[in-house]
């Protein structure tokens, strides 16, 4: 293993702000489907996939308030939600499949189109389907 040794007479100190992660935000947003209370999410990176997931959740019936300048989302889904996620909302994002599990858990049924997204290698959804089958989904 290589090392990086820093020698100096000045002590390093300070703080930096770490931006939020898209790959953490998308599953957290999908998981909000399981909760029927108000949720505040902070340090949200407002990138295209996050906006696509917001639009998908809004279509399903989730109330989402976006506070872009503060990187905050306020999520509320205390009403009956749709159990369908159409292709036109999933075609540009792989993470759309993540709403399938929470919708199945909450409503015992869901119809989610296969996701689109970029073609970086193979990223099949069969593992999601296999896991849901093992949990009793048909």
Kindly give the residue locations of the regions a language model identified:
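Structural preference for solvent-exposed beta-strand-turn elements
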Residues: 1-138
